[in-house]
């Protein structure tokens, strides 16, 4: 009986030792895997974010580009959409790549950021259409007025952004003059567009005290608009024009600043 008990104890001890050994091996294995992961992360960080292995990176990158180019992944076409005032050579110059260049070598974010430096471009999207095409979608700023300030002329958009000094292609745009005129031109033009006949006879809009507008109409007629709610005043002037009671009355100025009482001055 004692011999059996002694034998059982030995078996249990051996089993316990085996379990302990397996646990140690698993622990060593886990630590080894963790160490390899940490080493791999460090290597990748050094490879990507530092100048270490710069020669290897260049060699590998060059070989990847050469291999993919042979497989047909090279620049053959550039599709441009939304282009109106930005000329094509300007866009292609920003690509900084020739036909046949590795398409994966193109830095799309850099191309996008450089294109956005052009004042005409409000937003732009650049993408690859594999295997051989780059697609560029432009959203250009739309000029709505010519702003005169400090004896200089600028094309401005509805947000008042200065687009260009080249106003020659846009002689039809309304001239707005004065401090802050560029900022508020968008709302004024939007209202005037409701009355095309009046819009066509408006030669300039003067911003006064950064508070209100004076309109200069053809025929040397000045329209003094109120500081607030000038929409009703424009509606009144348009009604006069449609009734043929504006340009043949020898008017010099219409003072519409007080909505309760309008004043008319004749020559």
Curated annotation (Swiss-Prot):
Localization per record: Cell inner membrane
InterPro entries: Cell_div_FtsQ/DivIB_C (IPR005548), FtsQ (IPR026579), POTRA (IPR034746), POTRA_FtsQ_type (IPR013685)
Record topology, Cytoplasmic segments: 1-32
Highest rank taxon of the organism: Bacteria
Membrane topology: Single-pass type II membrane protein
Regions crossing the membrane: 33-53
Domain POTRA: 73-141
Keyword field: Cell cycle, Cell division, Cell inner membrane, Cell membrane, Membrane, Transmembrane, Transmembrane helix
Keyword Manganese: no
Broad class of where this protein is predominantly found: membrane
Record-level GO BP terms: cell septum assembly; FtsZ-dependent cytokinesis
Parts of the chain on the Periplasmic side: 54-267
GO cellular component, one term: plasma membrane
Function field: Essential cell division protein.
Family stated for the protein in its record: Belongs to the FtsQ/DivIB family. FtsQ subfamily.
UniProt name for this protein: Cell division protein FtsQ
